[in-house]
């Protein structure tokens, strides 16, 4: 169908394509459609199949051309992308530049479209990279074990009504809240109802945990909040807000006793509380190793990112921002649209820090995927069996069940990609030089800022 095509590479990993389709193809499709109409059309005064062509054209020419136009464009897209290696991103459909396309049956037809594609870049060989990473020496003590025991105790508690009816630290509270303007009118876009949180334990968006202590059921209060310049949510940082809050319910946790029976309730694998504590210690050691690997990989990707110019398309960045919004909304127990409403209504439309963080994460994803794609060693059936066996051991499902799940969901290729990804990360870690860092506690080490 395509007579010729001109392809231009534009900034932002964007591709511009000029497509030309021969007028002979256009005329052929038009005549075929006209003939089809002629054989089926019923017009008063004529038998079906006997309507003169000139009458059909006079009445339906523009509609016929529009149908042919749509068919030609769709056919051109299909033919072009069947051969073109630069594929469009799945979340960014091609866009036709011309606003009002029309067919002229006596001329070749041409149109221009643009689309965003996966960014191209080269990465240096891992073997040629000299990166040193300072890794803290992490120590654990009994308090780390106790903290995990307390977490399990809370998970296995029963939530009951607090008969005292007064908010205290660790109370589970349901509230309604809304921001107020300077005239104390409600800002409806910020209104939340039936928001549930644990006092002193939850990081609420407006940070009103301590402000509700001492309040009673159905009590309403207007809070005046001021936020420091480096507050965790930048849209609130350095600002002052009025917040109306109402207590709707107050509950508490009925905690189980921490003893051998408690350990047995957690899992059949534990006979005593000491068994549970030993498992927790082993699990903490695994977490430390995983965090150390994450720290080293972060260093690798940040170093490589600084050396690379990756022309990331706009739609890819927008998709990552959407993911970041979803994660933040979930952390704050908000719906996505509700969080966006609060986010944008605050006058905060963009953040350099947020964008930098998203770009950094996105670059890391692109780099690791590039390395996975370039990895010449194919995943064998033996590799798949080993990975399925590992997942079986960790999940309690049989190997057959896990394999059937991946096959039924058409995820075998995803599993192979994941195996390659782990192999690439292992190779990266083997080529990094680890320097002994300062001693830190387990609690400090798992803190995000230390592993940044």
Curated annotation (Swiss-Prot):
> Which range is the signal sequence, renumbered to this chain?
none
Q: Which SUPFAM superfamilies match?
A: FKBP-like, Triger factor/SurA peptide-binding domain-like, Trigger factor ribosome-binding domain
Recorded catalytic activity of this chain's protein: [protein]-peptidylproline (omega=180) = [protein]-peptidylproline (omega=0)
Which cellular compartments is it found in?
Cytoplasm
Q: Which InterPro entries match?
A: PPIase_dom_sf, Trig_fac, Trigger_fac_C, Trigger_fac_C_sf, Trigger_fac_ribosome-bd_bac, Trigger_fac_ribosome-bd_sf, Trigger_fact/SurA_dom_sf
Q: Per the record, what about its domains?
A: Consists of 3 domains; the N-terminus binds the ribosome, the middle domain has PPIase activity, while the C-terminus has intrinsic chaperone activity on its own.
Instruction: Give a short account of what the protein does.
Output: Involved in protein export. Acts as a chaperone by maintaining the newly synthesized protein in an open conformation. Functions as a peptidyl-prolyl cis-trans isomerase.
Tell me the PANTHER family matching this sequence.
TRIGGER FACTOR CHAPERONE AND PEPTIDYL-PROLYL CIS/TRANS ISOMERASE, TRIGGER FACTOR-LIKE PROTEIN TIG, CHLOROPLASTIC
What family is reported?
Answer: Belongs to the FKBP-type PPIase family. Tig subfamily.
Q: What is this protein called?
A: Trigger factor
- Organism listed in the record: Borrelia garinii subsp. bavariensis (strain ATCC BAA-2496 / DSM 23469 / PBi)
Primary gene name? tig
